Amino acid sequence: MKLVNVQEMKQLDQLATAEYAVPGILLMDNAAQAVADAVNDSLDELDGESVVVFCGGGNNGGDGFGAARWLQNYGARVRVFVVGKALDAVTGDAAAELAMLQKTDAKVEAIVGEDDWVVAELAAAKADILVDALAGTGFHGEPEGDLLRACRLMNDSEKYIVAVDVPTCVNADNGAVAENAVRADKTVTMALLKTGLLLYPGREYCGDIELADIGMPAKMVEECASKKYRLTDDIVRELLPLRKADAHKGDAGRAVICAGSPGFTGAAALSSYAAVKAGAGLVALYTPLSSRDVLAGKLTEVMVHGLLERMPGILGGGATGDVVKNANAADVLAIGPGLGTSESTQQVVRDILLQLQVPVVIDADALTALQGHTEILTQMQAAKVLTPHPGEMARLIGKEISEINADRINIAAQYAQEWNAVLVLKGAPTVIACPDGTVYVNSTGSSALATGGSGDVLTGIIAGLAAQEITLQEAAVCGVYLHGKAADISGIDIGLAAGELAQFLPEARCEVLKGN
C-alpha cells in the first residue's frame, strides 16, 4: 500500500484537477460521504442521533460541511460550528459545500463570541458523536485562539470523535503532535495513507484508521512519485521464498551466524534458532571458543564452531579468516548479537566486513564496531542490511535518539542511500529503507516485542530468509513483517519471550502465504 507525505498528496490533488479533469468539488463530496459513512458505521443507527461537526474554513472544513449534509440525509440531527471564520468568508469548494448544507435542515453557525462557545459546549455535551473537520494535513505547530479552544472542547467532551483526513494538530508527515491535538477514535483519511498517521505519537491520536476511495484516478495514483509503502500480506507474499517439493537441505540455503560470548550466549542461540525457524536449510554458528560448549548444548539443530580468542570472550585476529572463509562458502552471514565490544573483537568484526563477499546482516555489537568507522560501509563489497534500534542509530550518525524518532522515515532513507545498505530502523513502527530510495513502513507487531532478545530473533529471521535465494532487501522486508506477525498471532500482549516468538514463525509464514 503506497504512502505519501503532505506535499505528495497536495501534488496529487492538483494533478487530478489539472491533468485528469476531476473537479475538486467531486473529490470533496466523495470524501464527505466517506466521513458520513464512517460516522454511520460508528453508531448502531443514525435515525435521530445527534452529530456535532466542528469545521474550519479550509478544505478540511469543506469535507465537514459535505459530511454534515450527507449525515442529514441519513437521518441524523446535525449541528455544525464553524471555527475561526465567518460563514461568508468561506471560499472555494468549501463554500460550495457550505451552500449546499445551508439548504438542508442542519443548524450551521459560526463561533464569533463567548456566547457561541457556550452554545457549542452544550451541543457537544448532548451529542452522540463529534466530527473533527477543523484543520487538515497542512496545519503544523501549536493551535492558538479559537482553534485551541475547539480542540480542548472536543477532547474534554469524552465523546466518540471521527477525524477528517488527520486529527487536528497531528503532523501528517512525521506523526508529531501538538499539546492539545485532537484525540480521535476513528480517522478517515483520503485517497492514500499519510506517513504521519503510522508514526508515533501521532498514531495514538488517530484511533482506527479508514482509507477512503474518493475517486482519484487509479492510473495517477499508481504513477505517484512516492516510493514509500506500508507493508501488507500482499506485498510480502510476492517476496517470500518458496520451496520445491523435492528440495533438500542444501537447496534451502546455508546461513552462518557469528555471535555470542560468555554471559551473552542467549543472543547467539536466539539468532541461530530463528534462522532455522525462518527456513534456512543449514545454520552454522561461529562463536568465541569459550562459549562453544554452552551453545552446543543449547542448539541441537545448529552446527556450533569455536573461534580463536586472545582471552576468554575476546576474539583474536585468527578468527577473521575462519569466519570469512566459511561465510563466503555459505549464502549469508549475520554478525553481532552478543559478540562483545572489546577493541580486539571490534577490529575482527571490521576486518570480516571488509573481506566478506556474501550478503551480511549487521546487528548489535557489530553495529558498535562501526561507530566512528562508517566509511567501511561504502568500502565493503558485500550487500548489507543494518538493523539498529534508535539508540544504535543515534550513535552511528552522531544524533540524539529524540532526533531519530522525530524523523524516522527521512533519516532511514538518507543513510540507506549514503551507505548503499538496506537499513532496518527498529521501533514502532519499524522502517525498512533501501538504497534505491524505496521505504517500507511495517504494519505488524506490537509492544509485545519489547523484550530482550527480540532483535536477535529478527537478525536470525532475516539471515534465514536471505539464505533461500531471495535478495537481502527482500529478506529484510519479509523478515520484519514476519517478526511482527509472529508476535501478533501469538496472542500474547505482555510476557512474550523471544524464544517463544521464533516458534510462531512457521505459522506466521503460512498465514501470509494463504492470505489470512
Task: Write out the residue ranges for each language-model feature.
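Internal gly/pro-rich beta-alpha loop/helix module
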Residues: 124-129, 134-226
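Nucleotide and nucleotide-moiety/phosphate-recognizing core
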Residues: 37-134, 142-164
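Glycine-rich phosphate-binding loop
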Residues: 118, 125-142, 333-340, 417, ...
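Short acidic loop-to-helix transition motifs that present clustered carboxylates
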Residues: 113-117, 166-172, 195, 367-370
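Small-residue (G/A/S/T)-rich helix-start motifs and N-terminal tracts that mark the onset
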Residues: 1-84, 91, 95, 197-360, ...
